[in-house]
Amino acid sequence: MTTNSWHSILVIYLASLALDWSLEMGIHLEKSAYLALAGNFLRSNELSKVIDVVKEMVKSQHSLGVYHGAMLIHMLGFGRRPSLAAEALDLLPDDQKGLSAYTALMDVYISAGSPEKAMKILGEMREREIMPSLGTYDVLLSGLEKTSDFQRETSSLRKEQKSLVASTRFREIVHVEDKICM
């Protein structure tokens, strides 16, 4: 093994040890420590450990934030772990389960070849009265166009997207989450 391989193994081991020790001792870490641990586990592809870190963050009443939450969902999906991405969404407080987090999870499901789950997430999002952005439509349409099972939904989504484009031209205020999903 190379020196870099040993270094990576040691860093992962020490990060796991730090997390386990804090859990065992009942110690709540600072937000930056949780984020550093999550980053180490993401880089080493220890994705289930990332979820453990996020659970502890939530217990310690630290917030991932809208951006980090959506990025985490996206990265877990990129690691081909859609179930962990869905779990990450569930761990977010309701006020952070917004447009960017839902769009990220839809992208995960589309990438995993499960457009029906992406459509279910769209339904949940609409039930919470969160309106899709142009980026949300792009994600859905790119995945649904590859399958013949959702032709009616694809047509409907395309009409909604065109309507949103027309109304967005006259909108003066663009929300942060809309910018993230563009």
Curated annotation (Swiss-Prot):
Keyword presence, DNA-binding: no
Name of the molecule in the record: Pentatricopeptide repeat-containing protein At2g01360
Pfam family, one: PPR_2
UniProt KW keywords: Repeat
Family in the record: Belongs to the PPR family. P subfamily.
Cross-referenced InterPro entries: Pentatricopeptide_rpt, PPR-containing_protein, TPR-like_helical_dom_sf
Domain of life: Eukaryota
Spans of repeat PPR: 30-64, 65-95, 98-132
Signal peptide: none
